[in-house]
């Protein structure tokens, strides 16, 4: 009896301890393990809190994001090897606030090459949560495949007690390896919930359950390493795919924030500095001031600058657009990438309007 109690106590204490990492090469060129009966999943690592490191196991704020390599992350979750063969690619290792469109374009082109391989079943991207939704929607609109792509992150660094990253990573691999995930577009997975990249957004800067999809709802959840989807495979209505396989640079698009007494000349300044399009994070359902609208109208009429009216609120529908383009359901950060891709494709303002209206 005592041996059972001691074993239970030891197991309970072990569950509370932070993961202890043994550093090794951050790149995994070959499959870490291979079982012919398991699907192949490639993990592209971008950094972020999921790869964060702190000197204390109780530190969840003052840590270094992007400090742990993909091989070490996979080593910390040995159960992954029960669900798939894993190959890891360290694309970069930084906090996601440091990522640029060039980084995301590079990631996209790497994934395009990977999903073209017939033996690859799915893709996982480990990523910082600050800009995770931006990368996710970019992939959703540029990687035209039925193979599962799952973007995953964490809200606690890898060294923290009860770090959420290991379970999130395991769940992401399980979803990417599942046939049930085929044909669902790019997905975001944290905290046992599976969301569409098109509609899922980060809502809280600190809490574990930060990623939400308020209006569209989640695609499903994962329980006991089994994905449970609420609906048959489908992608968002009106979603357009853009070909960036040969793109080397994306046009600059800036976001301007709406507030009382905003300076309308900031829009002119952004264009003068090279912006090819603007996204306005308007008040309420995308309201912009009258002086601001006059400046925007001039940019549209005189310089053919496409301007998208979005909202600074957490969620909602933006059909206020003056003479610009309504963002409808997209928030500013996602609207920015949609506009960048549309401009890059050479679409007219009417084409872009149709894309945002989900009627293209």
Curated annotation (Swiss-Prot):
UniProt protein name: Probable L-asparaginase 3
NCBIfam families: asnASE_II
Assigned EC number: 3.5.1.1
Positions of the Asparaginase/glutaminase domain: 39-359
Top-rank taxon, per record: Eukaryota
Residues at the catalytic site: 49 (o-isoaspartyl threonine intermediate)
Higher taxonomy: Eukaryota, Fungi, Dikarya, Ascomycota, Taphrinomycotina
Secretion signal span: 1-16
GO molecular function terms attached to this record: asparaginase activity
């Amino acid at each position: 009896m005592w041996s059972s109690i001691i074993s239970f106590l030891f197991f309970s204490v072990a569950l509370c301890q932070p993961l202890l990492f043994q550093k090794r090469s951050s790149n995994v060129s070959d499959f870490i393990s291979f079982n012919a009966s398991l699907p192949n999943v490639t993990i592209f690592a971008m950094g972020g809190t999921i790869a964060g490191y702190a000197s204390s196991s109780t530190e969840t704020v003052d840590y270094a994001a992007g400090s742990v390599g993909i091989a070490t992350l996979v080593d910390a979750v040995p159960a992954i090897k029960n669900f798939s063969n894993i190959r890891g690619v360290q694309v970069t290792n930084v906090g996601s606030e440091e990522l640029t469109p060039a980084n995301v374009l590079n990631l996209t082109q790497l994934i395009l090459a990977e999903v073209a391989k017939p033996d690859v079943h799915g893709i996982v991207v480990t990523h910082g949560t600050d800009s995770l939704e931006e990368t996710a929607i970019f992939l959703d609109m540029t990687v035209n495949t039925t193979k599962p792509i799952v973007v995953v992150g964490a809200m606690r660094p890898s060294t923290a007690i009860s770090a959420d990253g290991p379970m999130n990573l395991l769940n992401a691999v399980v979803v990417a390896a599942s046939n049930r995930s085929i044909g669902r577009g790019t997905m975001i997975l944290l905290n046992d919930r599976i969301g569409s990249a098109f509609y899922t957004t980060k809502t809280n800067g600190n809490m574990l359950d930060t990623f939400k999809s308020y209006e569209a709802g989640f695609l499903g959840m994962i329980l006991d390493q089994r994905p449970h989807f609420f609906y048959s495979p489908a992608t968002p209505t009106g979603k357009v795919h853009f070909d960036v396989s040969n793109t080397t640079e994306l046009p600059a698009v800036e976001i301007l924030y709406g507030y009382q007494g905003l300076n309308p000349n900031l829009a002119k300044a952004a264009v003068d500095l090279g912006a090819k399009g603007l996204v306005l994070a308007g008040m309420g359902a995308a309201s912009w001031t009258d002086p601001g609208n006059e400046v925007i109208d001039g940019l549209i009429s005189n310089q053919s600058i496409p301007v998208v009216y979005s909202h600074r609120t957490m969620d909602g529908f933006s059909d206020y657009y003056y003479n610009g383009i309504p963002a409808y359901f997209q928030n500013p950060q996602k609207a920015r990438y949609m506009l960048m891709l549309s401009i890059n494709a050479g679409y007219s303002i009417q084409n872009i309007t149709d894309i945002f209206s989900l009627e293209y």
